[in-house]
Amino acid sequence: MRADVTSVPAVVLAHGYPSDVNAATVASSALPELADRIAGEMGWMAMALAFRGCGASEGSFSLQGWLDDLRAAVAHLEAEESVSGVWLVGFGTGGALSICAAAALPDVHGVAALGAPADFDDWASHPRRLLEHSREVGMIKESTFPTNFDGWARELRDIRAVADAPGLHPRPLLIVHGSDDDLVPVFDARVLVDAHGDAELRIMTGAGHRLRHDPRAVAVLLGWLDRQRNRIGSAPG
């Protein structure tokens, strides 16, 4: 996290859910480079968040836990005297949770969600499979976690970006999705746009799920962030 001027906009970058072994470390390590670019080239204060259970972060994965991590990151940035406003940028699961967090935090100025699912119903249909996968990739290390499996699983149905997107309006929402995403259907992007009511939708032709590595998607994101500077000093809706 860095900033070089006295009053700057701030952004939290939230990674997605890892898909394979060792990806829990990779997922959280992929965004610091982007954060440095946003800070160095655009003058923002940028935080690359490593959710609990990923990278060097302690704790174990749960959707509510990740949502709490996002809220804590926003609170941390808002406490900085030099910060003029906070935005959220999330990839995959991090994008969906960014929408949910911002809907409940009216001081967040806007959200960009890339490759974000509209809900987690697929996970909710097979919660034990998700739990075992989370153990396999190192996101759950404690053998006794979760102490309340039913509660852990319930979060998979209760936390839904599509339900929270209307609460983000009229604050800006950018939805970016790959036309060839094989993990999250492009239909989810359109559902989120409709739920918000005034979101900007950009479909990347031929792109898959990992938009962090697509130069076109990153260019769209940086352009959107640059336009958000004009919102500084105005109420976030």
Mark where each language-model region is:
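Conserved alpha/beta-hydrolase
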Residues: E33-A56
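Alpha/beta-hydrolase fold nucleophile elbow
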Residues: E81-G92
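Short, surface-exposed "cap/lid" segments of acyl-processing enzymes
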Residues: V5-E41
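Short beta-to-alpha linker loops that shape the active-site pocket of alpha/beta-hydrolase fold enzymes
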Residues: Y17, A50-G55, P117, A207
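A short loop-to-beta-strand scaffold at the N-terminal edge of the catalytic core in hydrolase folds
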Residues: M1-A3
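The alpha/beta-hydrolase serine catalytic core
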Residues: L105-V191, A195-I203, A207-G208, R212-G237
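Alpha/beta-hydrolase active-site loop
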Residues: A30, S60-E80
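Glycine-rich nucleophile elbow surrounding the catalytic serine of serine-hydrolase chemistry
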Residues: G90-C100
